[in-house]
From Swiss-Prot:
This is Neuronal acetylcholine receptor subunit alpha-7. Residues 23-233 are extracellular. PANTHER family: NEUROTRANSMITTER GATED ION CHANNEL. GO terms for biological process: acetylcholine receptor signaling pathway; associative learning; B cell activation; behavioral response to ethanol; behavioral response to nicotine; calcium ion transport; dendrite arborization; dendritic spine organization. It comes from Mus musculus (Mouse).
Length: 502
């Protein structure tokens, strides 16, 4: 029993001794490595030889793309590795110590920075420890939220593909002192973004020569290629704009008598202006290119503006004053003949017009009036007016070459017409009958003038209808062409629609 208990105590003592030796080896190794070590000295065996540094990065997330300020914000882990000639040891002399860690500033590390940084601190990395193994291989993995300047080309917005460059290089070492070598970027841990699709992040090593020095200055440039996802902008900007432009076509279908044609056109124009301001808020203030969506909005606003102008012309035609004159001949030929034939439009009541000589006109003379009046004494004004109107049954409508149709001309022979106009009749001794005939002539002239005014107004109203129908067809075709032509001019329009709207 005592022998077994003694064996247990010996095992515990050996374990504690091993732990204390392990800690002692690591402590002694740290003292040996940092003794006489200068963090400002480039750790190479031969000062004439460059120190090779392998550089790569791991892209975790595209956090934001600020189009207005042209800044790309990314979450990146940098990966740098090199061999430190002064940080090597024999593992047999320090058993169990495979690697050690040094904090920032205690050993040498390359001063690699993001050249096109837009951060206020410029260096946005979190300085972590440097991992060193027995062969002197050093590995430095600083994470950081990088803000880099990026030229945003908004020409094809919202169907655009952006390429933002991340240029890394040593800030103080040239190519003869530090040889920067590129490794492929890692995107295995990438977190997808709701606005952008990552298409790739290719890298390239460059060497640049400056006038001050003969040695090259290498840098590693990674190009973050990303495609904008258009579903959000399509639902919130493009589809409303298409619907608003379609509403602009309703201006030509709205009756002129409603009094709302101008109001509808102005309302649509103001709606497009509001959407234009929304796009201007997120776009950079640059004159290098006009965004695709701005081109579409501008063309739609031009269409709506022209529709308002045409609506003013239509309303002027529709409410034309008949005292302002008849329609010009060229206007009648173009609108009432050519355009109406092309649009398959007919004047209202054109098929119901009675031919000029459908009924044989009666000869109207005062003799017939006297015979009708001789049946009874003119004791009532109503009977006299009835006699007068019976004398006007010979009136009919006849077309005229200048204004289409003129109604109300008397179909009487010139002899009888002049006889009536001059008031010469057999019953000169009846003054009441003469007064009645004068009143009848006055009423007939008034009706004749009203008929002519109505014909003139109907011509102008029909011309307004023709202009409305013609502009409806023309503006519809132009709107469809602009919508398809402008939006489909984007290089990746089909790809964006197939991926985002599928």
């Amino acid at each position: 029993m005592c022998g077994r208990r003694g064996g247990i105590w010996l095992a515990l003592a050996a374990a504690l001794l091993h732990v204390s030796l392990q800690g002692e080896f690591q402590r002694r190794l740290y003292k040996e490595l940092v003794k006489n070590y200068n963090p400002l000295e480039r750790p190479v065996a031969n000062d004439s030889q460059p120190l090779t540094v392998y550089f790569s990065l791991s892209l975790l997330q595209i956090m934001d793309v600020d189009e207005k300020n042209q800044v790309l914000t990314t979450n990146i882990w940098l990966q740098m590795s090199w061999t430190d000639h002064y940080l090597q040891w024999n593992m047999s002399e320090y058993p169990g110590v495979k690697n050690v860690r040094f904090p920032d500033g205690q050993i040498w590390k390359p001063d690699i920075l993001l050249y096109n940084s837009a951060d206020e601190r410029f260096d946005a990395t979190f300085h972590t420890n440097v991992l060193v193994n027995a062969s002197g291989h050093c590995q430095y993995l600083p994470p950081g939220i990088f803000k880099s300047s990026c030229y945003i080309d908004v020409r094809w917005f919202p169907f655009d593909v952006q390429q933002c460059k991340l240029k890394f290089g040593s800030w103080s070492y040239g190519g003869w002192s530090l040889d920067l070598q590129m490794q492929e970027a890692d995107i295995s841990s990438y977190i997808p973004n709701g606005e952008w699709d990552l298409m790739g992040i290719p890298g390239k090593r460059n060497e640049k020569f400056y006038e001050c020095c003969k040695e090259p200055y290498p840098d590693v440039t990674y190009t973050v290629t990303m495609r904008r996802r258009t579903l959000y902008y399509g639902l919130n900007l493009l589809i409303p704009c298409v619907l608003i432009s379609a509403l602009a076509l309703l201006v030509f279908l709205l009756p002129a008598d409603s009094g709302e044609k101008i109001s509808l056109g102005i309302t649509v124009l103001l709606s497009l202006t509001v959407f234009m301001l929304l796009v201007a808020e997120i776009m950079p203030a640059t004159s290098d290119s006009v965004p695709l969506i701005a081109q579409y909005f501008a063309s739609t606003m031009i269409i709506v503006g022209l529709s308002v102008v045409v609506t003013v012309i239509v309303l002027r035609y529709h409410h034309h004053d008949p005292d302002g004159g008849k329609m010009p001949k060229w206007t009648r030929i173009i609108l009432l003949n050519w355009c109406a034939w092309f649009l398959r439009m007919k004047r209202p009541g054109e098929d119901k017009v009675r031919p000029a000589c459908q009924h044989k006109p009666r000869r109207c003379s005062l003799a017939s009036v006297e015979l009708s009046a001789g049946a009874g004494p003119p004791t009532s004004n109503g009977n006299l007016l009835y006699i007068g109107f019976r004398g006007l049954e010979g009136m009919h409508c006849a077309p005229t070459p200048d204004s289409g149709v003129v109604c109300g001309r008397l179909a009487c022979s010139p002899t009888h017409d002049e006889h009536l106009m001059h008031g010469t009749h057999p019953s000169d001794g009846d003054p009441d009958l003469a007064k009645i005939l004068e009143e009848v002539r006055y009423i007939a002239n008034r009706f004749r003038c009203q008929d002519e005014s109505e014909v003139i107004c109907s011509e102008w109203k029909f011309a307004a209808c023709v202009v409305d129908r013609l502009c409806l067809m023309a503006f519809s075709v132009f709107t469809i062409i602009c919508t398809i032509g402008i939006l489909m001019s984007a290089p990746n329009f089909v790809e964006a629609v197939s991926k985002d709207f599928a």
